[in-house]
C-alpha cells in the first residue's frame, strides 16, 4: 500500500510542477515573459534581433537575442535599451 501512496504523491507533485511551468509562459508563440530586467551593459555588436514580450505578461519588456541565441530581458524605458533598438533598426535598413 505504501508504494501506491508514494506513486500517487509523485504524480500529484509532477502535475503541479508542470502546471506551474505552463503558467509562466506568455501567449507570444512560446516566448516567455520576463521576470526581471538585465542591469548590465548591452553588447551591441553581439545582438542579432529583438522582440517585445506579449501584452499578457505582467512586465513590459524588450528581449534582445544575441548571436549565441541568449535572451536578454530589458526595460523598454532604459536609455541603453533605446540605443540598442536604434542600432538594430539601423542594421535592418542597410
From Swiss-Prot:
Residues 1-23 form the signal peptide. Disulfide bonds join 33-57, 34-73. One of its GO terms (molecular function) is chemokine activity. It comes from the Eukaryota. Its main location: secreted. It holds the Pfam family IL8. Keywords: Chemotaxis, Cytokine, Disulfide bond, Inflammatory response, Secreted, Signal. It is found in: Secreted. One of its GO terms (cellular component) is extracellular space. One of its GO terms (biological process) is immune response. Belongs to the intercrine beta (chemokine CC) family. PANTHER family: C-C MOTIF CHEMOKINE 17, SMALL INDUCIBLE CYTOKINE A. Chemokine, which displays chemotactic activity for T lymphocytes, preferentially Th2 cells, but not monocytes or granulocytes. Therefore plays an important role in a wide range of inflammatory and immunological processes. Acts by binding to CCR4 at T-cell surface. Mediates GM-CSF/CSF2-driven pain and inflammation. In the brain, required to maintain the typical, highly branched morphology of hippocampal microglia under homeostatic conditions. This is C-C motif chemokine 17. It comes from Macaca mulatta (Rhesus macaque).
Amino acid at each position: 500500500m505504501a508504494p501506491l501512496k508514494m506513486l500517487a504523491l509523485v504524480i500529484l507533485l509532477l502535475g503541479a510542477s508542470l502546471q506551474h511551468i505552463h503558467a509562466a509562459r506568455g501567449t507570444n508563440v512560446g516566448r516567455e515573459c520576463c521576470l526581471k530586467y538585465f542591469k548590465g551593459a548591452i553588447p551591441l555588436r553581439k545582438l542579432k534581433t529583438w522582440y517585445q514580450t506579449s501584452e499578457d505578461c505582467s512586465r513590459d519588456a524588450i528581449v534582445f537575442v544575441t548571436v549565441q541565441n541568449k535572451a536578454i530581458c530589458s526595460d523598454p524605458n532604459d536609455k541603453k535599451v533605446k540605443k540598442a533598438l536604434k542600432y538594430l533598426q539601423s542594421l535592418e535598413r542597410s
